[in-house]
Amino acid sequence: MTEEVDFLGQDSDGGSEEVVLTPAELIERLEQAWMNEKFAPELLESKPEIVECVMEQLEHMEENLRRAKREDLKVSIHQMEMERIRYVLSSYLRCRLMKIEKFFPHVLEKEKTRPEGEPSSLSPEELAFAREFMANTESYLKNVALKHMPPNLQKVDLFRAVPKPDLDSYVFLRVRERQENILVEPDTDEQRDYVIDLEKGSQHLIRYKTIAPLVASGAVQLI
């Protein structure tokens, strides 16, 4: 993996810009997205560009290995690296699917009310999966239980029935970019007593809701 990768990312205005990454930088971004997704209580922004680029890199690595001599030690090393990358990628995608299944009404409502220009939490494939999952859930509940109930009880509000992500849960994080005047308890009257600075490289245990924007921007990394 030595070739550079053209990566389509988000600029500061919410538009798209082409970023050239080395394969190592691409894998680092995948691992960052994976860790954040594992430890965040909510479904984070979709990263389809990263997923697509990593899959392309895996294909290139497979082609290179097919041309390499089997007895070469480098072949075994590259095979192990490929398996590691595949594990991270599949774990990342599984984690996202589990959150979609767990919070599907809220995920779909968030997508429905998403302001124009704001990054989506769902890739097109994930959106189709979430809609199908909701339709199947509604159909199952209707056929198994609701149709046997009195007419006034044959409806269920899945948005109210399914728990929301707990944004007040606490998460561990490592600071990647120094942040000043972070309000860690925004709901208190004496807010000035709860303002802190986050030094680069420091680690903290903080309420997720407080630092969610910093996770989205990449200023902090969940660990």
Curated annotation (Swiss-Prot):
Intracellular or extracellular location(s): Nucleus; Chromosome; Cytoplasm
Modified residues (N-acetylmethionine): M1
GO CC annotations, alphabetized: CMG complex; cytoplasm; GINS complex; nucleoplasm; nucleus
Source species, domain of life: Eukaryota
This protein's record includes keyword Transport: no
Residues with the N-acetylthreonine modification: T2
Location of Phosphoserine modifications: S12, S16
Gene3D superfamilies for the chain: 1.20.58.1030, 3.40.5.60
PANTHER family per record: DNA REPLICATION COMPLEX GINS PROTEIN SLD5, SLD5 PROTEIN
Subunit structure, as described in the record: Component of the GINS complex which is a heterotetramer of GINS1, GINS2, GINS3 and GINS4. Forms a stable subcomplex with GINS1. GINS complex interacts with DNA primase in vitro. Component of the CMG helicase complex, a hexameric ring of related MCM2-7 subunits stabilized by CDC45 and the tetrameric GINS complex.
Name of this protein: DNA replication complex GINS protein SLD5
Gene that produces this protein: GINS4
